[in-house]
Amino acid sequence: MSLYMVRYSEIGLKGDRERSRMESILMDNIRKYYEIIGLRASCRIMSGHVLVEADGDGPLRHIMGIKSYSPVLRFRAETLEDITRIASEIYREKVRGKTFGVRCNRTGTHSFTSLDVERAIGDSLYDASAGVNLKNPDIWIHADIVGKDVFFYHEIIPGPGGLPLGSEGKYISLVSGGIDSPVSTWMIMKRGSPCDILFCSLSYPVDLRPFVDVVKKLVERWAPYRKPRIYVADCRSLIRTMVIEGRTKYSNVTFKRVIYRIAEKIALENGYNGIVTGESLGQVSSQTAENLKAIESGIGVPILRPLIGMDKDEVVDMARRIGTFPELSMGEFCSLFASRPIIRSKPEDIDEDMKQIDMEELFEGIRAYDIDDLSVALRTDLSLKGSIPKDAVIIDLRSRSQYEKDHIPNSINLPLGDAINVEDKGRTYVVYCGMGLQSAYVASMLRNRGITAYYSTFSDLKKRLSEKESGNITGIDQPAE
């Protein structure tokens, strides 16, 4: 096992009682993370740091509350001569041909000063090095002395910072399978607040797959010791109300109000301190200042928007850095309601739209899962695998102009409302659209009626046909169920 000195930042600014509480939470999280992945770890507080003895340092990079850490070598040394000798044995070859600097921190009473230590170690290594550089050396040598223990290290590895997860109150976070919402959730977790998660499904269970993939990435890397509760709201009825029947005037904004209302109900019934969203000011039509005001009007719990001042490029960079950037995307579900986006709505406009929404029906469709149970439940895959089934009815959901420009041979162009109402249960249907979300919705609705249906995208089917014609894939048709 190796030894690591773990540093925190804000915890050290707390009063004694709160500091002790947060230190305990941090150490508990460290031990649990290692235990869950099958490794050993022990830790204790030492002079404003956490000393961790563990099998490797992988988890330390991902535990909220850790500002930085260093692999350290610990020795017992009572005199300046002992400290200098040990430092020379460790670092003489490491500094050969390189510039270096020495930094010493001490806790306790000693017969020498920190400056004495720095000078003595520097003198002992100087002749083997390329010289001393106290501004930007090739290697910094650190000697932290606590009583008669000396800790040597030369690496400082950054952690995520923030506060220990679980040290602040919990929130319910709105998460999709996209880029923004997992980042906003991570940012609140970094501030010490556990987040349970709400997903509003418009093509249940198809759109759960990319959502679960992103959540698992977030949890497995950053909080395997505190897995979230997942709430899934079946919102497929909104497609008929808002898109097919067109009963709402401000659909792109009203849809967000609906999600807020669902989250509010969950928050009030389960003791969450507020709602976390991935909205950024002005990024899309529903996120103008006026629309954000209209969306949250009447919501009775606080709403946190960690990304409010961030550019999209900044969010994408952070998603890649924290490992939640989605490999595949069906498109943001909000795009279904954005054919005529409204950029400046008023609260009373959305209040009027909400009269068309049966919120009680949506509330009844909320289900709660553990993330592992939800993963097991998603065994049914409605996406098309292999070739198009023989004699399948191919439905193109794109606009008429897109269909006339190019389409899959033998496909028929149908609007969303007609596609979900096909009558021939003896046929197999392959439904495609631009991003895969509308086709996934239709496939899930047809499956609910006992009709065999698969979904895909126009680009994916074009690629499959091209590969088939070139002989890169077999021409065997996928059998119908």
From Swiss-Prot:
<feature type="active site" description="Cysteine persulfide intermediate">
    <location>
        <position position="433"/>
    </location>
</feature>
<feature type="domain" description="Rhodanese">
    <location>
        <begin position="388"/>
        <end position="463"/>
    </location>
</feature>
<dbReference type="InterPro" id="IPR014729">
    <property type="entry name" value="Rossmann-like_a/b/a_fold"/>
</dbReference>
<dbReference type="GO" id="GO:0004810">
    <property type="term" value="F:CCA tRNA nucleotidyltransferase activity"/>
</dbReference>
<comment type="pathway">
    <text>Cofactor biosynthesis; thiamine diphosphate biosynthesis.</text>
</comment>
<dbReference type="GO" id="GO:0005829">
    <property type="term" value="C:cytosol"/>
</dbReference>
<keyword id="KW-0963">Cytoplasm</keyword>
<dbReference type="InterPro" id="IPR050102">
    <property type="entry name" value="tRNA_sulfurtransferase_ThiI"/>
</dbReference>
<feature type="binding site">
    <location>
        <position position="256"/>
    </location>
    <ligand>
        <name>ATP</name>
    </ligand>
</feature>
<dbReference type="InterPro" id="IPR001763">
    <property type="entry name" value="Rhodanese-like_dom"/>
</dbReference>
<feature type="binding site">
    <location>
        <position position="287"/>
    </location>
    <ligand>
        <name>ATP</name>
    </ligand>
</feature>
<feature type="binding site">
    <location>
        <position position="278"/>
    </location>
    <ligand>
        <name>ATP</name>
    </ligand>
</feature>
<feature type="binding site">
    <location>
        <begin position="174"/>
        <end position="175"/>
    </location>
    <ligand>
        <name>ATP</name>
    </ligand>
</feature>
<keyword id="KW-0820">tRNA-binding</keyword>
<dbReference type="Pfam" id="PF22025">
    <property type="entry name" value="ThiI_fer"/>
</dbReference>
<comment type="function">
    <text>Catalyzes the ATP-dependent transfer of a sulfur to tRNA to produce 4-thiouridine in position 8 of tRNAs, which functions as a near-UV photosensor. Also catalyzes the transfer of sulfur to the sulfur carrier protein ThiS, forming ThiS-thiocarboxylate. This is a step in the synthesis of thiazole, in the thiamine biosynthesis pathway. The sulfur is donated as persulfide by IscS.</text>
</comment>
<dbReference type="Pfam" id="PF00581">
    <property type="entry name" value="Rhodanese"/>
</dbReference>
<keyword id="KW-0067">ATP-binding</keyword>
<dbReference type="GO" id="GO:0009229">
    <property type="term" value="P:thiamine diphosphate biosynthetic process"/>
</dbReference>
<dbReference type="InterPro" id="IPR004114">
    <property type="entry name" value="THUMP_dom"/>
</dbReference>
<dbReference type="InterPro" id="IPR054173">
    <property type="entry name" value="ThiI_fer"/>
</dbReference>
<keyword id="KW-0694">RNA-binding</keyword>
<dbReference type="GO" id="GO:0002937">
    <property type="term" value="P:tRNA 4-thiouridine biosynthesis"/>
</dbReference>
<dbReference type="GO" id="GO:0009228">
    <property type="term" value="P:thiamine biosynthetic process"/>
</dbReference>
<keyword id="KW-0784">Thiamine biosynthesis</keyword>
<dbReference type="InterPro" id="IPR036873">
    <property type="entry name" value="Rhodanese-like_dom_sf"/>
</dbReference>
<keyword id="KW-0547">Nucleotide-binding</keyword>
<protein>
    <recommendedName>
        <fullName>tRNA sulfurtransferase</fullName>
        <ecNumber>2.8.1.4</ecNumber>
    </recommendedName>
</protein>
<keyword id="KW-0676">Redox-active center</keyword>
<dbReference type="InterPro" id="IPR003720">
    <property type="entry name" value="tRNA_STrfase"/>
</dbReference>
<dbReference type="GO" id="GO:0005524">
    <property type="term" value="F:ATP binding"/>
</dbReference>
<keyword id="KW-0808">Transferase</keyword>
<dbReference type="Pfam" id="PF02926">
    <property type="entry name" value="THUMP"/>
</dbReference>
<dbReference type="GO" id="GO:0140741">
    <property type="term" value="F:tRNA-uracil-4 sulfurtransferase activity"/>
</dbReference>
<comment type="similarity">
    <text>Belongs to the ThiI family.</text>
</comment>
<dbReference type="Pfam" id="PF02568">
    <property type="entry name" value="ThiI"/>
</dbReference>
<dbReference type="InterPro" id="IPR020536">
    <property type="entry name" value="ThiI_AANH"/>
</dbReference>
<dbReference type="GO" id="GO:0052837">
    <property type="term" value="P:thiazole biosynthetic process"/>
</dbReference>
<feature type="domain" description="THUMP">
    <location>
        <begin position="54"/>
        <end position="156"/>
    </location>
</feature>
<keyword id="KW-1015">Disulfide bond</keyword>
<dbReference type="InterPro" id="IPR049962">
    <property type="entry name" value="THUMP_ThiI"/>
</dbReference>
<dbReference type="GO" id="GO:0000049">
    <property type="term" value="F:tRNA binding"/>
</dbReference>
